[in-house]
Amino acid sequence: MQIQDDAGRARYDALMEVIRRRMTVRAFDPSHEVPREHYEMILEAARHSPSGANAQPWHFIVVTETGLKRKIMEYFREEQLRRAKLKMKFPTPDYRGLASAPGLIVVASDFRWVRAFPVLNDGSELDRMYKQNAERILLQSVAAATMAAHLAAAALGYNVWWVTAIGQEAAQKAMKPLLGIPDELSVLDIMCFGPPAKAPYKRWKKSLAEITNWNRFDPAHAMTEAQIDEWVATQRQKAMYKDASNVD
């Protein structure tokens, strides 16, 4: 099938408009009610995502009960305080927005699906390496579905929040009983969405030239350990939370 240049460009421009308007907020207008149809449209987009071996190793738990949202928020508030006591120096977000998010979807996966990917299952060192890669395949697959859901929410006019601080064992122990998730599954992230409590702003992005390499990696793009440590110490918080001049 030959793609017409004008039609292809129009589709690209429409897609880029959605991608650019997908902005993170952490405080929502709690008065908005997400219609069931919007949940289904968002998850329909996720359903069509690519996955390793077409295993589709994802499950989505739609949380609409106010009490459940509050309990999820309470766990993350405890995590916020825990990080403060540990003096991690990480600019932890304000998790109270979890309770006010009109839309909330918990993303889970079953790591037994790594068996669908190239593995030996003989306990060898080579098998360990293959299984390590298989876990990456699974995580990449679920991330692709989650991103599709985020873009669908943005297309519907919502702002979003990708909550990732959920991999540690304490989070699993808190979330699984609360949501009736079987032990065999793992909670990977939470998607919040809705109209923002206040106008969002676009985060700083690296320029196209900084991230693009043709045929070989450009050594000028490599960073030393010291440069990365310097960025974390001086630029991370600005990149996460502040407006910047280099926003496109």
Which role fits each region the language model picked out?
Residues 2-7, 11, 186-248:
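C-terminal helix-cap and adjacent tail motif
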Residues 19, 42-46, 191:
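Short alpha-helical scaffolding segments that buttress acidic/His motifs in well-ordered protein cores
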Residues 42-47, 105, 111, 121-178:
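Small-aliphatic-rich amphipathic alpha-helix that forms the alpha element of a beta-alpha
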